[in-house]
Amino acid sequence: MSRHSRLQRQVLSLYRELLRAGRGKPGAEARVRAEFRQHACLPRSDVLRIEYLYRRGRRQLQMLRSGHATAMGAFVRTRGPTEESNGAGAPGTLSGEGDDPRKPLDSMRTPKTPLDGR
């Protein structure tokens, strides 16, 4: 087995630190494991995303260690009737939202009024 890269060692260290910091806090260990499992399939070549998630994890670790956190959880958004069911697009985005980066305000459509003014 090859040696881990520096970034891999940092991520593994962060994982262990988060598990230690989450001991005694309801839901923390399960949340840490779930978050790391969710992103385990990221390709090694996606360094920017891995570094972003690493920094985000570092901030969460600081919050857990600060003493202000008593538990750890997550907000889960359920699918609405207007969301795509095939999983296309980013998670949590509505269908048609952000399809064209040149028109960012198109998703904020205003209702059309009839020509007769009613």
Curated annotation (Swiss-Prot):
Disordered, as annotated region: 72-118
Pfam families xref list: Complex1_LYR (PF05347)
GO biological process, alphabetically ordered: mitochondrial respiratory chain complex II assembly
Key words, A-Z: Chaperone, Mitochondrion, Repeat
Main localisation: mitochondrion
Motif mapping: LYR motif 2: 53-55
Region (Interaction with SDHB): 53-65
Sequence motif LYR motif 1, residues: 14-16
Superkingdom of the source species: Eukaryota
CDD domains: Complex1_LYR_SDHAF1_LYRM8
Compartments where located: Mitochondrion matrix
Gene Ontology cellular component terms for the protein in this record: mitochondrial matrix; mitochondrion
Similarity section: Belongs to the complex I LYR family. SDHAF1 subfamily.
Role, per record: Plays an essential role in the assembly of succinate dehydrogenase (SDH), an enzyme complex (also referred to as respiratory complex II) that is a component of both the tricarboxylic acid (TCA) cycle and the mitochondrial electron transport chain, and which couples the oxidation of succinate to fumarate with the reduction of ubiquinone (coenzyme Q) to ubiquinol. Promotes maturation of the iron-sulfur protein subunit SDHB of the SDH catalytic dimer, protecting it from the deleterious effects of oxidants. May act together with SDHAF3.
Quaternary structure and partners: Interacts with SDHB within an SDHA-SDHB subcomplex. Also interacts with the iron-sulfur transfer complex formed by HSC20, HSPA9 and ISCU through direct binding to HSC20. Binding of SDHAF1 to SDHB precedes and is necessary for recruitment of the iron-sulfur transfer complex by SDHAF1.
Protein name, as recorded: Succinate dehydrogenase assembly factor 1, mitochondrial
Organism of derivation: Bos taurus
Organism lineage: Eukaryota, Metazoa, Chordata, Craniata, Vertebrata
